[in-house]
Protein backbone atom coordinates (compact mmCIF):
# COMPACT_ATOMS: atom_id res chain seq x y z
CA UNK A 1 0.00 0.00 0.00
CA UNK A 2 1.16 3.52 -0.69
CA UNK A 3 -0.08 6.98 0.31
CA UNK A 4 -2.59 7.02 -2.53
CA UNK A 5 -4.23 3.86 -1.20
CA UNK A 6 -4.13 5.22 2.35
CA UNK A 7 -5.91 8.35 1.13
CA UNK A 8 -8.68 6.18 -0.36
CA UNK A 9 -9.08 4.39 2.98
CA UNK A 10 -9.28 7.69 4.87
CA UNK A 11 -11.87 9.04 2.42
CA UNK A 12 -13.95 5.94 3.04
CA UNK A 13 -13.62 6.28 6.81
CA UNK A 14 -14.87 9.88 6.65
CA UNK A 15 -18.15 8.91 5.00
CA UNK A 16 -18.87 5.27 5.90
CA UNK A 17 -19.69 3.44 9.12
CA UNK A 18 -17.49 0.47 8.22
CA UNK A 19 -14.41 0.18 6.04
CA UNK A 20 -13.46 -2.87 4.00
CA UNK A 21 -10.21 -3.00 2.04
CA UNK A 22 -9.57 -5.70 -0.53
CA UNK A 23 -6.06 -6.71 -1.50
CA UNK A 24 -5.97 -8.77 -4.67
CA UNK A 25 -3.34 -8.70 -7.37
CA UNK A 26 -5.39 -9.61 -10.41
CA UNK A 27 -3.45 -11.71 -12.94
CA UNK A 28 -5.98 -10.95 -15.68
CA UNK A 29 -4.99 -7.26 -15.57
CA UNK A 30 -1.45 -7.97 -16.74
CA UNK A 31 -0.42 -8.40 -20.37
CA UNK A 32 2.84 -10.17 -19.53
CA UNK A 33 3.32 -12.88 -16.91
CA UNK A 34 6.60 -11.24 -15.89
CA UNK A 35 4.74 -8.02 -15.00
CA UNK A 36 2.43 -10.02 -12.75
CA UNK A 37 5.32 -11.89 -11.15
CA UNK A 38 7.31 -8.67 -10.57
CA UNK A 39 4.40 -6.67 -9.18
CA UNK A 40 5.24 -5.51 -5.63
CA UNK A 41 3.77 -7.75 -2.91
CA UNK A 42 3.96 -6.51 0.68
CA UNK A 43 0.98 -8.19 2.32
CA UNK A 44 2.31 -8.31 5.91
CA UNK A 45 3.33 -4.65 5.77
CA UNK A 46 0.02 -3.69 4.16
CA UNK A 47 -2.01 -5.43 6.86
CA UNK A 48 -0.02 -3.65 9.57
CA UNK A 49 -0.79 -0.31 7.91
CA UNK A 50 -4.49 -1.18 7.71
CA UNK A 51 -4.55 -2.20 11.38
CA UNK A 52 -2.99 1.13 12.29
CA UNK A 53 -5.67 2.88 10.25
CA UNK A 54 -8.32 0.87 12.15
CA UNK A 55 -9.85 -0.62 9.01
CA UNK A 56 -12.79 -2.83 9.99
CA UNK A 57 -12.28 -5.61 7.44
CA UNK A 58 -9.47 -6.70 5.15
CA UNK A 59 -10.31 -9.11 2.36
CA UNK A 60 -7.37 -11.01 0.83
CA UNK A 61 -8.89 -13.54 -1.55
CA UNK A 62 -6.82 -15.99 -3.55
CA UNK A 63 -7.19 -16.58 -7.28
CA UNK A 64 -9.45 -19.64 -6.83
CA UNK A 65 -11.82 -17.65 -4.63
CA UNK A 66 -12.12 -14.90 -7.22
CA UNK A 67 -12.27 -17.07 -10.32
CA UNK A 68 -14.69 -19.81 -9.39
CA UNK A 69 -16.48 -21.75 -12.12
CA UNK A 70 -19.19 -19.12 -12.41
CA UNK A 71 -16.89 -16.10 -12.57
CA UNK A 72 -15.61 -14.83 -15.91
CA UNK A 73 -11.92 -13.87 -16.06
CA UNK A 74 -12.76 -10.99 -18.37
CA UNK A 75 -15.83 -8.84 -19.03
CA UNK A 76 -16.14 -7.38 -22.51
CA UNK A 77 -15.88 -3.62 -22.84
CA UNK A 78 -17.10 -1.21 -25.48
CA UNK A 79 -14.44 -0.38 -28.06
CA UNK A 80 -14.65 3.30 -27.06
CA UNK A 81 -12.60 2.31 -23.98
CA UNK A 82 -9.84 0.78 -26.11
CA UNK A 83 -8.04 4.11 -26.39
CA UNK A 84 -5.43 5.67 -24.08
CA UNK A 85 -4.54 2.96 -21.51
CA UNK A 86 -7.01 0.56 -23.10
CA UNK A 87 -5.05 0.66 -26.35
CA UNK A 88 -1.70 -0.16 -24.76
CA UNK A 89 -2.90 -2.60 -22.12
CA UNK A 90 -5.20 -5.01 -23.94
CA UNK A 91 -7.30 -7.05 -21.54
CA UNK A 92 -6.49 -4.85 -18.54
CA UNK A 93 -9.87 -3.17 -18.15
CA UNK A 94 -11.71 -6.41 -18.93
CA UNK A 95 -9.84 -8.04 -16.04
CA UNK A 96 -10.53 -5.11 -13.71
CA UNK A 97 -14.27 -5.30 -14.43
CA UNK A 98 -14.36 -9.05 -13.79
CA UNK A 99 -13.01 -8.54 -10.27
CA UNK A 100 -15.18 -5.47 -9.58
CA UNK A 101 -18.20 -7.50 -10.69
CA UNK A 102 -17.27 -10.42 -8.42
CA UNK A 103 -16.63 -8.17 -5.40
CA UNK A 104 -19.83 -6.15 -5.79
CA UNK A 105 -22.01 -9.22 -6.35
CA UNK A 106 -20.54 -10.85 -3.24
CA UNK A 107 -20.08 -7.93 -0.87
CA UNK A 108 -23.01 -5.61 -1.61
CA UNK A 109 -21.12 -2.51 -0.46
CA UNK A 110 -22.69 0.96 -0.59
CA UNK A 111 -19.62 2.76 -1.96
CA UNK A 112 -16.28 2.06 -3.58
CA UNK A 113 -13.46 4.60 -3.65
CA UNK A 114 -11.18 5.06 -6.66
CA UNK A 115 -8.37 7.49 -7.36
CA UNK A 116 -8.54 10.06 -10.15
CA UNK A 117 -5.01 8.99 -11.17
CA UNK A 118 -6.66 6.15 -13.08
CA UNK A 119 -9.39 8.32 -14.57
CA UNK A 120 -10.14 6.14 -17.58
CA UNK A 121 -10.50 3.13 -15.29
CA UNK A 122 -12.70 5.16 -12.91
CA UNK A 123 -14.96 6.24 -15.78
CA UNK A 124 -15.29 2.68 -17.06
CA UNK A 125 -16.01 1.25 -13.59
CA UNK A 126 -18.47 4.03 -12.79
CA UNK A 127 -20.49 3.30 -15.95
CA UNK A 128 -20.30 -0.46 -15.42
CA UNK A 129 -21.42 -0.23 -11.78
CA UNK A 130 -24.19 2.28 -12.53
CA UNK A 131 -25.86 -0.21 -14.92
CA UNK A 132 -25.65 -3.22 -12.58
CA UNK A 133 -25.43 -2.26 -8.91
CA UNK A 134 -26.71 0.23 -6.34
CA UNK A 135 -23.13 0.97 -5.30
CA UNK A 136 -21.86 4.55 -5.52
CA UNK A 137 -18.42 5.01 -7.10
CA UNK A 138 -16.55 7.81 -5.31
CA UNK A 139 -13.72 9.63 -7.11
CA UNK A 140 -10.85 10.70 -4.83
CA UNK A 141 -8.06 13.21 -5.41
CA UNK A 142 -4.70 12.02 -6.73
CA UNK A 143 -1.97 11.99 -4.08
CA UNK A 144 1.45 12.92 -5.45
CA UNK A 145 5.01 12.15 -4.45
CA UNK A 146 7.67 14.82 -3.93
CA UNK A 147 8.65 14.26 -7.57
CA UNK A 148 5.08 15.31 -8.53
CA UNK A 149 4.34 11.83 -9.89
CA UNK A 150 1.17 10.24 -8.57
CA UNK A 151 1.74 7.45 -6.08
CA UNK A 152 1.61 4.10 -7.84
CA UNK A 153 2.71 0.58 -6.98
CA UNK A 154 4.51 0.52 -10.32
CA UNK A 155 6.68 3.56 -9.55
CA UNK A 156 9.33 1.18 -8.22
CA UNK A 157 9.79 0.06 -11.82
CA UNK A 158 10.50 3.60 -13.12
CA UNK A 159 14.13 4.72 -13.44
CA UNK A 160 15.32 8.25 -12.54
CA UNK A 161 15.60 9.38 -16.16
CA UNK A 162 11.97 8.40 -16.80
CA UNK A 163 10.88 10.21 -13.61
CA UNK A 164 12.54 13.42 -14.85
CA UNK A 165 10.78 13.10 -18.20
CA UNK A 166 7.41 12.41 -16.53
CA UNK A 167 7.80 15.44 -14.25
CA UNK A 168 7.62 17.68 -17.32
CA UNK A 169 4.04 16.52 -17.85
CA UNK A 170 2.70 16.77 -14.30
Regions found by a protein language model. Give the residues of each.
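Nucleotidyltransferase catalytic core that binds NTPs
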Residues: 1-170
Amino acid sequence: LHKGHISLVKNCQKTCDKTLVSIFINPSQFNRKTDYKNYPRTLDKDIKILKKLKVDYVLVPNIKEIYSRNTPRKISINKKYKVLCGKYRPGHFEGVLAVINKFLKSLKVKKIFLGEKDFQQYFLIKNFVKKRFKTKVVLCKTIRMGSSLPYSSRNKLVDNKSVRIAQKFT
